[in-house]
């Protein structure tokens, strides 16, 4: 009498292939609920509805409050590839356990009696029972105080007149994040986070040659000064557009802040010495569709009825408006401010699918196209 050999359990090299994403809000899916921006009814841009960030099995809640792992997140490339989004909005390279507020798992092996785990430990446990072919990482911006910087810039814009602007780029608390010593510290933090990813995979039974780490860079969210469709004089830049940055601060954001954060990411990756790293360069991926850019507009400015209208993705913004305590209302949340929205995330998902390259990940730069592909994502190129 013959019996079939027992089926091998899924794990390293066995079972359906998986892509796992680790990092912060820029990859977890923050703002993924919204497709474009409007100052009219929020229903016009509400692509995913009130359950947008629910990621538990029953679709009834978040597994970790505030992580905002949206259903539009780039992890979910499909095409026969399974996905797990372990990233968390607000995450730094290291785990944060505030006395009040939400738990923020970093790219470490944190574990506590409440069952809370760092993202590296979560990856290790997941990878042991799933066939992970690529781990995509986007981390570092919160180490540089991203949210604090944005708040400082917007506050300075709103509280100073155009004839005597108070810039954020020369504020001591902002400059402190970008000193040579500070950048070197964050570069080391990124390096160690990526080495934790490698250690997690090693602990789960993976040789370096059996998977790739795809290191992603941050996308510029706003244009340079010449690309804004609202003047910096008056208040329309913030009150209408939700992009209250002085021209000089917008230029600094692109020439200095985004550059130095991304240098910490790529230099940190290089310093690991790992040979299984690939790069997804996304710095300019949203160009032409950024917040308040003069090539796009609010839905009502472009005559677009809803996010589902033909051509909406080419006419409206791929980055969410900055909302403040006085302008946040209804279903919007302050933490969604200045993140790639539904369209931005779908565009980056397209990029990640191309970087994944059918299981043989490659390095490349992602560039925006026009129109939508068969998955309903903005067309992008990767080379």
Residue map of PLM features:
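C-terminal accessory extensions appended to soluble enzyme cores
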Residues: 356-383
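Catalytic nucleophile-elbow at a beta strand-turn-alpha helix junction centered on a G-D-S/GDSL motif
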Residues: 17-34, 45, 144, 342
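Conserved SGNH/GDSL esterase-like catalytic core that processes O-acyl groups on lipids
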Residues: 42-181
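A structural motif corresponding to the C-terminal end of an alpha-helix
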Residues: 74-83, 186-213, 249-281
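Secretory targeting and sorting signals
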Residues: 1-9
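Short, solvent-exposed loop/turn and secondary-structure capping segments
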Residues: 12-13, 29-35, 95-99, 146-151, ...
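Solvent-exposed loop/turn segments at secondary-structure junctions
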Residues: 25-29, 88-94, 141-146, 219-223, ...
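Mobile gating loops/cap/lid regions near enzyme active sites that modulate substrate access
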Residues: 220-339
């Amino acid at each position: 009498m013959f019996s079939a050999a027992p089926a091998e359990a899924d794990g390293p090299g066995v079972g359906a292939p998986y892509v796992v994403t680790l990092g912060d809000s820029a990859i977890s899916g923050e703002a993924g609920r919204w497709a474009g921006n409007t100052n009219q009814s929020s229903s016009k841009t509400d692509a995913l509805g009130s359950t947008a960030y629910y990621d538990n099995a029953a679709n009834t809640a978040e597994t970790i409050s505030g992580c905002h792992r949206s259903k539009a997140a780039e992890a979910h490339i499909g095409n026969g590839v399974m996905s797990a989004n372990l990233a968390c909005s607000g995450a730094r390279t290291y785990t944060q356990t505030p006395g009040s507020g939400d738990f923020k798992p970093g790219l470490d092996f944190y574990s506590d009696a409440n069952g809370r785990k760092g993202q590296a430990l979560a990856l290790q446990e997941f990878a042991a029972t799933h066939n992970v072919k690529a781990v995509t990482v986007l981390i570092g911006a919160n180490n540089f105080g991203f949210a604090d910087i944005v708040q400082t810039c917007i506050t300075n814009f709103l509280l100073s007149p155009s004839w005597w602007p108070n810039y954020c780029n020369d504020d001591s608390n902002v400059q402190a994040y970008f000193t040579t010593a500070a950048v070197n510290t964050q570069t080391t933090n990124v390096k160690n986070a990526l080495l934790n990813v490698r250690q997690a995979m090693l602990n789960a039974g993976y040789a370096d040659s059996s998977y790739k780490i795809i290191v992603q860079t941050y996308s510029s969210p706003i244009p340079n000064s010449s690309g804004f469709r609202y003047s910096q004089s008056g208040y329309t830049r913030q009150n209408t557009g939700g992009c209250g940055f002085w021209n000089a601060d917008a230029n600094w954001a692109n020439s200095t802040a985004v550059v130095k954060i991304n240098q910490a990411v790529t230099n940190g990756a290089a310093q690991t010495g790992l040979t299984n790293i690939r790069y997804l360069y996304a710095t300019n991926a949203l160009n032409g569709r950024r917040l308040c850019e003069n090539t796009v507009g609010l839905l009502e400015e472009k005559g677009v009825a809803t996010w589902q209208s033909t051509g909406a993705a080419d006419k409206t913004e791929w980055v969410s408006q900055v909302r403040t305590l006085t302008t946040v209302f209804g279903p919007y949340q302050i933490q969604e401010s200045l993140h790639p929205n539904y369209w931005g995330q779908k565009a980056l998902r397209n990029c990640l699918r191309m970087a994944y390259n059918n299981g043989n990940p490659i390095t490349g730069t992602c560039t925006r196209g026009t129109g939508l592909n068969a998955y309903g994502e903005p067309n992008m190129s990767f080379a």
